[in-house]
């Protein structure tokens, strides 16, 4: 009897273990290590976060360069972004340099106001540093592109439009961009918008909206849509956007922070101003950078 009971107990335990293993979600495969950079952890500033990794193609004529800015809501993320794993080989095949930038996050802002300024200042500082390395790294300054997703997309849109495209950026590729960080405009475009208050030091969206007029100069400085409206069309880069479709009329965005409406509204402003903007993928972005400048009308400065 005791042996029978023991066998039954073992069978029940084994069955429970098997069922729990079957019900458990499959573990995510760890991201593959990125290919070894040509230059790892290049320092472009005094803060520990101000570093970049650089992948250069084989020597030859000066090459285009893509500067990648990671996402993460300006709260997390780093330059070792897994999505680079599929982009690095494509860039090498097209003889395009790839530079991945790490930057200070909102938590590193200290007394800086608005907090998002430290993120934007680092991205623009990184671009200046890359430009200063053009001769050493064999880069063609007339063919510099910027790319990022989510918060990184916001950062590269800002960097490509600030100062009337002062860096001479030829093309920008974004995924899931926040093309406006004006709370009033965001609610008009996407009624259930809830992102962005912490960029300006507010605890929630409604408080930010209530105090909008107090921070309007900052909004005008850092919001891509506002910068786009003021940019000289002939100086603007070409834009390639990727991401989900916009919700149907009357429907709320399931993910308002990454709604396709951001992309659509930005494209409408571009169309009204005669600025190149299309829906596309990374390959289309690379093609814009590998064309002769005579075909795009974009010249480096």
Task: Label every model-predicted segment.
Residues 128-190:
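Primarily recognizes the serine-hydrolase "nucleophile elbow" in alpha/beta-hydrolase
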Residues 34, 47, 183-230:
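Mobile cap/lid helix-loop segments that gate and shape the active-site cleft of serine hydrolases
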Residues 73-79, 98, 129:
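Serine-hydrolase catalytic-loop signature spanning alpha/beta hydrolases and amidase-signature enzymes
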Residues 27-60:
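N-terminal cap/lid segment of alpha/beta-hydrolase-fold proteins
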Residues 80-99:
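Short amphipathic alpha-helix adjacent to the substrate-entry channel of hydrolases
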Residues 114-135:
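Alpha/beta-hydrolase active-site loop
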Residues 181, 210-283:
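Serine-hydrolase catalytic core
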């Amino acid at each position: 009897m005791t042996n029978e009971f023991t066998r039954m107990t073992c069978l029940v335990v084994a069955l429970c273990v098997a069922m729990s293993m079957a019900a458990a979600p499959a573990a995510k495969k760890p991201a593959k290590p990125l290919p070894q950079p040509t230059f790892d952890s290049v320092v472009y500033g005094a803060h520990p976060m101000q570093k970049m990794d650089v992948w250069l193609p084989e020597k030859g004529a000066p090459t285009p360069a893509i500067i990648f800015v990671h996402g993460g809501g300006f709260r997390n993320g780093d330059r070792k972004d897994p999505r680079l794993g599929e982009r690095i080989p494509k860039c090498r095949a097209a003889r395009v340099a790839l530079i991945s930038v790490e930057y200070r996050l909102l938590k590193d802002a200290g007394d800086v106001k608005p907090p998002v300024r430290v993120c934007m200042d680092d991205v623009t500082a990184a671009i200046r540093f890359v430009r200063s390395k053009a001769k050493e790294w064999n880069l063609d300054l007339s063919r510099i592109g910027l790319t990022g997703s989510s918060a990184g997309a916001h950062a590269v849109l800002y960097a490509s439009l600030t100062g009337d495209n002062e860096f001479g950026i030829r093309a920008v590729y974004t995924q899931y961009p926040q093309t406006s960080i004006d709370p009033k405009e965001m609610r008009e475009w996407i009624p259930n918008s809830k992102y962005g208050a912490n960029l300006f030091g507010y605890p929630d969206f409604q408080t930010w909206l209530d105090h909008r007029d107090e921070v309007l100069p900052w909004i005008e400085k850092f919001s891509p849509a506002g910068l786009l409206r003021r940019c000289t069309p002939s100086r603007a880069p070409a834009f390639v956007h990727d991401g989900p479709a916009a919700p149907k009329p009357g429907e709320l965005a399931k993910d308002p922070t990454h709604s396709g409406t951001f992309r659509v509204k930005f494209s409408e402003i571009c169309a009204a101003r005669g600025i190149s903007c299309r829906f596309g993928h990374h390959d289309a972005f690379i093609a814009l950078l590998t064309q002769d400048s005579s075909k795009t009308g974009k010249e480096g400065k």
